[in-house]
Amino acid sequence: MYWTEKHWIKLAIIVFIALPVISFILGSAIMLSYTYWPTDYSKMKMPHIDPMTQNIVLIAHGRGDTPASWAAPLKVILEQKISSPRDTAQVIALDWSAYSSSIFRCSVDGMRIGHALGETIAESAELQSVHLIGHSCGAYVVLGLCESLKAKRNDIEVQSTYLAPVSIYGALFWNYGINHFGDCANFSEAYIDSEDGVAGSNQLIPNTHTFNVTDARKATRSSKSPHIWPTYYYLQLVRSGVYPSLRTTSDLWATYPQGQMEKIDALPHKK
């Protein structure tokens, strides 16, 4: 067969245009199928919810993490701060590590786990308030739980606290977190480091009052990475006893206006 110029042009189109496009489409389809493929979450032990509790604090660690790094220590501090004979409160350091490791799936799995938890928690007849705290991809556990809980029990007051939250949802929606974090809660605050390289973890979250704790890290000369630093800062904040809490202050938006960024240049001092 004699190859004319038209044949070579067709071959070039196939090699340099059609094949890359087909490969991209096929690769994207495989990635999205993996990202959104259903799972039953049987490897995760759902927390027992005390049916008589009036207040719940739930802490969700981030991608590839476990409660041991900061969530479990925070649980201990919070239990010391909020427990009293007249006030029943349950503090949960959620272990969802079996589903938090994938950079593509952690937001999707976190949201689904949050939705399931919200439906369960909504059945607690005595429940009055919930404080949700999430780091990195754990922000989606917080968002999902808030959404499903409010859908069933809008009477329950919800505070959501986001620590260096990841904005990307499902490897596709880059601004999902920025647009949705804090939008279903009665009050929401975020703690970010502006030098964090993770998308969404380094900027104002419009539906929250955002604390920029970058200067506090620099002032203490901390060796912790910008993505981890907000968890450490929040631990110190809770330990100090001066952290924002709907349990103690009903109108937090008056003190911490929504949609504003506040710079913090030092660690909090204990009361």
Give the positions of each predicted feature.
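Predominantly extracellular/secreted Zn2+-dependent metalloproteases
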Residues: 46-49, 240
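Serine-dependent carboxylesterase/thioesterase catalytic core
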Residues: 40, 55, 62-63, 68-77, ...
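Proline/glycine-enriched tight loop/beta-turn segments at coil->beta junctions
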Residues: 49-55
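N-terminal membrane-anchoring alpha-helices
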Residues: 2-42
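A conserved mid-domain beta-alpha-beta active-site/ligand-binding segment of alpha/beta enzyme cores
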Residues: 210-243
